[in-house]
Each structure stands twice: as C-alpha cells, then as structure tokens.
Amino acid sequence: MLQKPRNRGRSGGQAERDRDWSHSGNPGASRAGEDARVLRDGFAEEAPSTSRGPGGSQGSQGPSPQGARRAQAAPAVGPRSQKQLELKVSELVQFLLIKDQKKIPIKRADILKHVIGDYKDIFPDLFKRAAERLQYVFGYKLVELEPKSNTYILINTLEPVEEDAEMRGDQGTPTTGLLMIVLGLIFMKGNTIKETEAWDFLRRLGVYPTKKHLIFGDPKKLITEDFVRQRYLEYRRIPHTDPVDYEFQWGPRTNLETSKMKVLKFVAKVHNQDPKDWPAQYCEALADEENRARPQPSGPAPSS
C-alpha cells in the first residue's frame, strides 16, 4: 500500500483511512466531500487539510466566471447525486473541447444555455471542476480571453514529456496528459500497475476502454498499442491469472524523455502538495536523479 501525503495536523485515525494515489477506499467518506473533487477524487480520497486549491495559494486558480456570487446565492435546489454531478462536469468538458476545435472563443452565455441548464446554482463549482479536468487530463488550461469578457479559450500547457508528432492522436491532438496520468499511476503503485486497476481509475475520468473518446480516439488502442509501440509503456501478461490480466510498466523511451522526479512533481501538482509529501516515492526519485547525474558508459563503438 502506497503512502499518502504526510499528515498535517490530522488525527492518528486519519492515517488508517489513507489509501493509495489511484484508489478511493474510505467507506466513511461523505458523498459531498467526494463530489467536491474532480480529478483529485480519483487520485486520492482525501488531501491534507492544508490543501490550497490547484493554484498553490488560498482559494482556487483559473477563471472565475462572472455571476459566481449570484449563482451561489440562488435558492437551494434539491441535492444532486454523485453520478449527476459527474455527468454534468463531463458534459461541460466535452462542450468546451468541441468548441475549442473551431478555435472560436467560448461564451459564458452559451455554456449556461447549452450545458448548465438547471444547474446554475452550482455553476461556479462545475466550472472549476471542468477547468481542473481539462488541465490535468487533457493538458489544456481554461482562461478568460479578457477580464470580465465572459469569453474563454483553451490553451495547451501540459508538456512534461518531450512531445513529437508520434505523440499526437489521429486529429493531431496532444495525448501527453493521458500518458502522464498512466505514468503517474505506475510510479505511485510501485512501478507496476495491473491493467484492470488502471482502467478502474481512468473510467472515473471519463476514459473508457470500450468507448470512442473525443480527444483520445480509441483509448485502449492508444494505451495498449500506440504507447507500447512508441516504447513509452511496457505491456505484459501476468502469469497464472484467471481471468487473464495484464500489467503496465514504464518503457525505455519514458526513462529517456522524462524522470521519476518529473512525474512525481506532476502528481504533487494535481494534489497541490510538495513531492516530499510522499517520502518513499521522493527518495526513489532522488536516487533516480543521482543515478542519472553519474557518467554513463559509452555505447558500443560503430563497426569499421
């Protein structure tokens, strides 16, 4: 079992409830608390009480849609289920991605009209959660085009792995975000993760092995064939499993283009924590950095 970030002012019982990076395993966690996290609710059940929002400062980062206060002050509506909220966030993300393909600024009025509907009372929260998912899963940052313009665009910001033409999907769309998530899962799970566990996690982000995805196309083919062919991942059958299961490990290209420290920093950014908050992984990443700094033996000399 992996270590969660160190306790910061939490009770001893909290440590017993901690789970690994990729699995939510606390049966006592409230639905409301789980609903308030988009990407992080899949990475870990709870973050330390000093979590500051995705930007690293008190409060949230990114565009704050006009009318947020009015929306928060709107008359209360009956509680929505976890499934309803996640579907609405997924719908908003899909709407923003489709609009961005035409490179036309996205108007807040269109978002409210075509997506939000009766969810106006929680629009600020839906907007924030959609922005987080866009950034950490797809590598896009949702920004307001001009102050108080109520018009938004998506910009590509996630490039932790050296990306080339091979790293782009059929439509020329970056797949770095998905790759980094899979690499993070592998590292945080002890450098190996079962395929079934990986898909259990990715489903929570709206990425399914059997469904066509707007950005990633065929996710199963992308992960188990394309990333493997590009040598970012190793994909092996686990012996003596019934039903048959497979596992993922980092491939040699990943070790050349990125590092455990860079991937750990990506995970820490998602949690809004410091890489040192995962002592075991941080020590492993440091050792990897030291090993990389040592002079490496030269390769075989070309034959004459």
Curated annotation (Swiss-Prot):
The keyword Phosphoprotein applies. This is Non-structural maintenance of chromosomes element 3 homolog. It is found in: Cytoplasm; Nucleus; Chromosome, Telomere. The keyword DNA damage applies. Its main location: cytoplasm. GO terms for cellular component: chromosome, telomeric region; cytoplasm; nucleoplasm; nucleus; Smc5-Smc6 complex. Changing F266A: Abolishes interaction with EID3. Keywords: Chromosome, Cytoplasm, Disease variant, DNA damage, DNA recombination, DNA repair, Growth regulation, Nucleus, Phosphoprotein, Telomere, Tumor antigen, Ubl conjugation pathway. Component of the SMC5-SMC6 complex which consists at least of SMC5, SMC6, NSMCE2, NSMCE1, NSMCE4A or EID3 and NSMCE3. NSMCE1, NSMCE4A or EID3 and NSMCE3 probably form a subcomplex that bridges the head domains of the SMC5:SMC6 heterodimer. Interacts with PJA1. Interacts with E2F1 (via C-terminus). Interacts with NGFR (via C-terminus). Interacts with NSMCE1. Interacts with NSMCE4. Interacts with SMC6. Interacts with EID3. GO terms for biological process: cellular response to hydroxyurea; cellular response to radiation; cellular response to UV; chromatin looping; DNA repair; double-strand break repair via homologous recombination; negative regulation of transcription by RNA polymerase II; positive regulation of protein ubiquitination.
